[in-house]
């Protein structure tokens, strides 16, 4: 489903594939050769979303930009990136050739330099910068500029260093910050989506006609299979690293 938001509407390259059950709304630009799979949500709320060429957004991933009168958090994703199933990315800048695995979360103002990655369930927090080629291990937390990587049990320490509500919602971190953030965000969202309208157009790329005797071209399904293969290799590599770490601990 493709929706306009006021005068803003998505721009999808003619060679990109958008699944019928994906949702794209507002000032979103999707580059050549991209694949946006079923259930993915890409929404521009007051700031633009830009996705570079040959990037894959997998099932049920949520990509958002956010911007109001006080702060702007556009979302920029480079070329040849993979955003895995159920990943959540908002208001960040992601360079070329990055890998964002299943269930990862990347928050406002974060920056992933070229070739960096976030493994399963990893978090890149507000205003954090991952250096070129750097990786966040499974379920670990990256915070700071440049990033320091923390294990899951250090989450309270990271939280104590952050000013999440001030940075994201412009709300001071007092006792009622959660309630005030909800009220502020609700007002913003109602205004941002008040003029949403479903557009008739839908981008579902069809293969070019073949001449008699020609081999069939690679299909969208084959391309998705390659992406899944890459993700499985990533999982296997992480498991090997985990087992090696366990052996080292036992040996020590």
Predicted regions and their residues:
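Well-ordered beta-strand segments characteristic of repetitive beta-sheet solenoids
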Residues: 18, 36, 53-57
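Glycine-rich hexapeptide-repeat left-handed beta-helix
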Residues: 1-9, 45, 53, 58-77, ...
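Short HxH-centered metal-ligating active-site micro-motif
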Residues: 82
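Intrinsically disordered, compositionally biased tail regions
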Residues: 234-252
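Extended, small-residue-rich solenoid/repeat segments and analogous flexible loops
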Residues: 1-33, 41
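Short Cys/His-rich Zn2+-coordinating modules
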Residues: 15-17, 36-37, 79, 100
């Amino acid at each position: 489903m493709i929706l306009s938001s006021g005068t803003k509407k998505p721009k999808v390259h003619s060679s990109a594939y958008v699944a019928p059950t994906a949702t794209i709304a507002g000032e979103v630009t999707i580059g050549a050769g991209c694949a946006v799979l079923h259930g993915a949500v890409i929404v521009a709320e007051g700031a633009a979303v830009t996705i570079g060429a040959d990037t894959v957004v997998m099932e049920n991933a949520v990509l958002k930009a956010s911007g109001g009168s006080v702060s702007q958090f556009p979302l920029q994703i480079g070329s040849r990136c993979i955003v895995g199933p159920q990943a959540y990315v908002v208001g960040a800048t992601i360079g070329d050739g990055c890998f964002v695995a299943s269930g990862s979360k990347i928050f406002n103002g974060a920056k992933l330099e070229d070739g960096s990655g976030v493994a399963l369930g990893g978090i890149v927090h507000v205003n954090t910068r991952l250096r070129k080629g750097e990786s966040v291990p499974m379920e670990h937390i990256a915070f700071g500029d440049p990033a320091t990587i923390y294990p899951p049990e250090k989450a309270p320490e990271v939280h104590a260093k952050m000013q999440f509500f001030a940075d994201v919602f412009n709300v001071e971190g007092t006792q009622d910050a959660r309630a005030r953030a909800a009220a502020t965000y609700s007002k913003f969202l109602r205004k941002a989506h008040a003029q949403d309208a479903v557009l008739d157009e839908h981008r579902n790329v069809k293969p070019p006609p073949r001449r008699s005797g020609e081999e069939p071209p690679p299909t969208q399904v084959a391309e998705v299979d390659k992406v899944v293969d890459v993700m499985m290799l990533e999982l296997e590599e992480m498991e090997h690293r985990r087992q090696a770490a366990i052996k080292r601990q036992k040996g020590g």
